[in-house]
Amino acid sequence: MAEFELEVLQPERIFFKDKVEMIVVRAIDGEIGIMAGHEPIVTPIGIGKLRIKKGGKWREAAIAGGILEVNQNKVVILSDAVEWPEEIDRQRALAAKERAEKKLQQKLPPDEFERYQAALYRAINRLRMIEERRNGD
């Protein structure tokens, strides 16, 4: 299977940089799969899983949204937070979920509501990744 270069960048580190066969990530209007030779695009991506196929095997990471750019057989993803399941601190994720749920029970201005709703989605996504890894999904 043909490969392309994938770079996943965070403000503080290069999360992933290698040749891969395929990636699947959640875009705004649903999941998008990228393979070698994909048309150039730039699209926002949502909170969810980043699935990477390399050497015939899939690996998954939790991603907190970002921007994806495909250009000339190279994909660059910019995200504030991307983690392999083994990097996720379950207690921190649970605490973040509880904080967000507590805040969302209050009357908040729309911008704060959206911020805490996104924090809740990120925490739930991180916890799901831990559970799926534990269950072998």
UniProtKB/Swiss-Prot annotation:
Gene3D superfamilies, A to Z: ATP synthase delta/epsilon subunit, C-terminal domain (1.20.5.440), F0F1 ATP synthase delta/epsilon subunit, N-terminal (2.60.15.10)
Cellular component terms (Gene Ontology): plasma membrane; proton-transporting ATP synthase complex
Subunit description: F-type ATPases have 2 components, CF(1) - the catalytic core - and CF(0) - the membrane proton channel. CF(1) has five subunits: alpha(3), beta(3), gamma(1), delta(1), epsilon(1). CF(0) has three main subunits: a, b and c.
HAMAP family per the UniProt record, alphabetical: ATP_synth_epsil_bac (MF_00530)
NCBIfam families tied to this protein: ATP_synt_epsi (TIGR01216)
Family note: Belongs to the ATPase epsilon chain family.
Name of the molecule in the record: ATP synthase epsilon chain
Native source organism of the sequence: Caldicellulosiruptor saccharolyticus (strain ATCC 43494 / DSM 8903 / Tp8T 6331)
